[in-house]
Each structure stands twice: as C-alpha cells, then as structure tokens.
Amino acid sequence: MKQYLALALAALLLVGTLASCVQADPNAIDDYTPDIDYMVDEAGNTFYFEETEGEGAILVKYVGKSTKDDRVKIPARFVVESQGIDRTVVGIGASAFYGKASIVAVEIPATVTSIGTQAFAGCTNLTSITFPNGMLSVGSQAFANCDKLATVSFGQSLESVGDHAFWHCTALTAVTFPETLKTIGEGAFYHCTALASVNFPAGLESVGTLAFCNCLSLPEGVEDTIPATAKKGDFLFVIDEELLTTEAVTDPAEEPAE
C-alpha cells in the first residue's frame, strides 16, 4: 500500500514541480503584454487588466496601498475614461493576488466566472471567500497555502475545482458543493486537516487522486458518500503521517504562475 501511495504522490507532485520551473514572476510588470492596462480605485489601489475577446477583461495583477488588513473589492467593470475603455470583469487571472499576505478579505463581483491558477495562493491572512453564483471554475492551486481560510461559499453554478486548489488550507472546516459541480481535481483539498464535513452532489463525475488525502478530521465512511457513477482517483482519503512528511512531498505553490 505504501509503495503505491509513494508512487502516486511522486507522480502527482512532479507535475506541479515541472510547471513551477517555467513560471514567471507575477510582480514583473515587464512580463506583461502591451494590451494590459490599469485602473486605480478611490482608495488608491491599482488593478491591472488584460482585455479579452468581446467586451470582457481579466484581472491579472493587484497592487494595494494597505500593508495589512487589506479588504479588496474587485471592480465589476474595467473603466479608463481617457482611453474609452469600459469592459466587464469576467475573470481573475493567474497569480493576480499571489502571496499578498496583507489581504484579509476579498469581494468578488457577480460578473466573474473563473479564478485562475494560483490566483490567491499564499494569501496567508485571507479568512473567508464567497464565490458569486455565476462562478464556473476554480483553477489549480488557486487558494493553496491559505492557511487561515476557514470558510468558502461556492455559489450555485460551480462546475470544477482544479488540482491542488485548496492545498494545505488547514483552517477550512466544512465544504458544501453546489449541485452543479462535476469535477474535483487531484489533491484539491490535500492536507486540509480541520476539514470535518464535505458533501458530494449527485451529478459529480470525477474526484482526482489524493483529493482529500490527509484530511485528518473527516469521518470514517465519507468515501461511501461519493456517487457510485463518479470516477474516483486513488488514495482519496488516505492518512499516513510517516509517508506524508517525507521530503518527497513538496508544496505545489512554491513558485507563482505566469
């Protein structure tokens, strides 16, 4: 059993390691393409946006004025009157808030439908998050290492939770998925040690390998509540302290995504 688990861990974490090797620093504005512009809100916070096809925009970077207790309100529209820009904010891009330890709260507008890779990874003082009802997907490692994140409201339309999305969210106590959820990625809630309650909607189609591995507070028999029709990865709820504290287990969110 341990040999198979070790192999699964190695394969899963190798993917994250390889991805990290090619990721750029989101703090380097020079990496951004020329079609990115910014707006400043009334509080003096700067939001950088990338225009999408149609009339949409994706938030790709945030620079806040506050150095602590920062409460972010993401605008629903990207407006630069001097340039004639007025677009709907439809997504939060990769690493947009990566490592922003000053952030304690984020308000996401109803217009947003997706959260990108590592968008809030390492926001170590973020305590709760509420997704709008139109949210469809949460990207890989989106909230990895948000170790004070205690509550998450998933809205009513969510379809997918990406790989390692809530990796090491050790304060998270309960997860209630909407009936629309289809997929839970690999290691999505890995080492959420306080997680004591989770529901699986009837329409769930797949749960990835190690999705709830080392969730020490989950009750026995929780795996039996996954719909019989759902495809299940290996070692979903395995708890093995000796194996999981070896050097082979590395953090998939150590480097910011591009």
Features from the language model and the residues they span:
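Positively charged n-region of N-terminal signal peptides that target proteins for export
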Residues: 1-10
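Hydrophobic core
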Residues: 9, 13-17
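Sec-dependent signal peptide cleavage junction
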Residues: 17-32
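Intrinsically disordered, low-complexity coil segments
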Residues: 27-28, 52-56, 64-66, 80-87
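GGW-centered surface loops in extracellular recognition modules
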Residues: 37-64
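Structural signature of tandem-repeat unit edges
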Residues: 42-44, 67-91, 101-114, 124-137, ...
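Short, surface-exposed, low-complexity cationic segments
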Residues: 59-64, 71-72, 95-97
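Consensus positions within tandem repeat domains that build extended binding/scaffold surfaces
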Residues: 94-96, 116-119, 139-142, 162-167, ...
